[in-house]
């Protein structure tokens, strides 16, 4: 059985020392780089775009898991492929033609993910669940790092795992927002496959050790 994936969120890195933080993730037990792209429209915050992606593409030695919190994401599918994205996740709430969007992501040679805001029902995925590689469950309201974890996420993950099994989907369940050393084990038990961790990693005294702890499977 595959071990769970830990994906530090670059949004929480020190952008004055970005290359240092990239090297830290490279040297750690982390599996992916999680990259949040925000446009100030779909979410209130603006993060970063292609220049930062190009830096990550140049120095990162692990896959780039790019999470688009932007309106009409299909406009940029090829551009994100060119910037190094290996997985491209779009929000179901922001994509007018989700099936076509997923097809275009896969045609460009990337893995396709769909993200759900905290209020969004998992059954909106029924008709697309077998076409995607990842479901990103937002466990905070999207747009800002460092928010408090929404407790209902556990029940949502359990229900989503059941749906994936019923539909015979191989999609991974990714949790994004408020993941820490106190809740990560319960998330794994609930059915999570990928843990996105921002402040928990980058605000800790020893980020490499924190990542190591997040990789542990408690008995």
Feature names for model-found ranges:
Residues 175-179, 196-200:
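Glycine-rich beta-strand-to-loop/alpha-helix junction loops that act as flexible
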């Amino acid at each position: 059985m595959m071990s769970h994936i830990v994906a530090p969120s670059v949004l929480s890195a020190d952008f004055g020392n970005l290359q240092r933080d990239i090297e830290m993730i490279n040297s750690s037990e982390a599996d992916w780089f999680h990259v949040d792209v925000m446009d100030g429209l779909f979410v209130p915050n603006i993060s970063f775009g292609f220049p930062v992606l190009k830096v990550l593409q140049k120095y990162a030695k692990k896959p780039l898991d790019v999470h688009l919190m932007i309106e009409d994401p299909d406009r940029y599918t090829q551009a994100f492929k060119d910037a190094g994205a290996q997985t491209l996740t779009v929000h179901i709430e922001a994509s007018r033609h989700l099936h076509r969007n997923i097809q275009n992501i896969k045609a460009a040679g990337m893995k396709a993910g769909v993200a759900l805001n905290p209020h969004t029902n998992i059954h909106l995925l029924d008709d697309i669940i077998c076409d995607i590689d990842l479901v990103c469950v937002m466990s905070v309201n999207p747009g800002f790092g460092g928010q408090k974890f929404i407790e209902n996420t556990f029940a949502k993950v359990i229900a989503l795992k059941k749906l994936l099994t019923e539909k015979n989907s191989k999609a991974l369940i990714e949790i994004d927002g408020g993941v820490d050393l106190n809740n990560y084990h319960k998330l794994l038990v609930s059915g999570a496959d990928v843990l996105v961790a921002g402040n928990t990693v980058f605000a800790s005294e020893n980020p490499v050790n924190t990542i190591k702890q997040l990789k542990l499977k408690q008995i």
